[in-house]
């Protein structure tokens, strides 16, 4: 009699008629015992074009070990990724947001095509993170997302540096404030190994969101990419997905209106990326949960900023880990009544459970208390007007002023803007408008980070 947990894979592996399929699988090392167990997909985006996903194959091996230890048979799947940091300022950036759909679609196709009973998606670079949640919500088979971790800061002349410093170094060099030799020295040390961008850019914003969404194990996403504990989180993810399979617990059990509001709250409280709006709306859509732009504005009006994180602040994701992790932020937000405490994580704990167990590092300066926030309201605003009648998103995490007035410089594309910046042809106090970078103009809905390179040069 087939294992009742083989809800999908029995059709692929069981019975005399499936002998050809079993023969194929036995040719690459699977045996009858393996094929009698539930089949768990382990998907990742290892690629040799970026540090963000460079540890995925190693983590996938550990996830697979965890699956086997809990009585399942893992099957590894690899798909593509596009690095914003590498492609920025080139035509390759047009592929960035499109890659989110391709990652989700390709994992879905592999999962359906090979009758996976459950799925673990290892994610790293910006667009892979929402893609992992999107495909789980779409398939709605037992599964979870594991973030492969943030990069550690580099060291440059006795201070910590990140890729943000390199971007700003490009502007400093263009302005004659930094020599080519110094820029090269900075370039060589800013990124010391595997991991996604260290600031609260898109990757760490979405890794934060997915923990509060409940679709990632609590505490797992904040463990840095090169920390020895990352292997342990991967092994436990493999064991945990088998527990979800035993229970019949599926992603849409966790991705609810309340958990999405928790994720939005976490993005706002950490000064997260505008891309958080774009991606959370896509995840909600896949899960069948209604979500509007106004929901972000409503929550932002009452949620304070508690984490002092780059690009506007002082610290990076590895510092959040050292300070006690996202559970400390959850504890403070829960104190202020900003979270739904009864929302469950994939490991069965509620958010209240996780917050109650928070272990804050004494003397840490990264995460503020709810009684003394860094800023009284959240880091994102939704605006409407003649330039954006359907709404637009702006990030105000590091801004104190509420009004800006200045002459507009309008460019038809990022390339023209960047040329003007490098030529120092933009007056201080100008309002820079870059047109034709949307779905039709880009084309392909060029990511907001496409603008990072020229705006970082405005120093």
What are the roles of these predicted feature ranges?
Residues 96-262, 267, 272:
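Active-site cavity-forming subdomains of large catalytic enzyme subunits
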Residues 20, 25-26, 73-121, 178, ...:
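Glycine-rich oxoanion-binding loops at beta->alpha junctions
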Residues 449-455:
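Conserved small/polar residues in nucleotide/adenosyl-binding loops
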Residues 55-98, 278, 295, 388-405:
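Anionic-ligand anchoring segments at beta-strand to alpha-helix junctions in alpha/beta enzyme folds, i.e.
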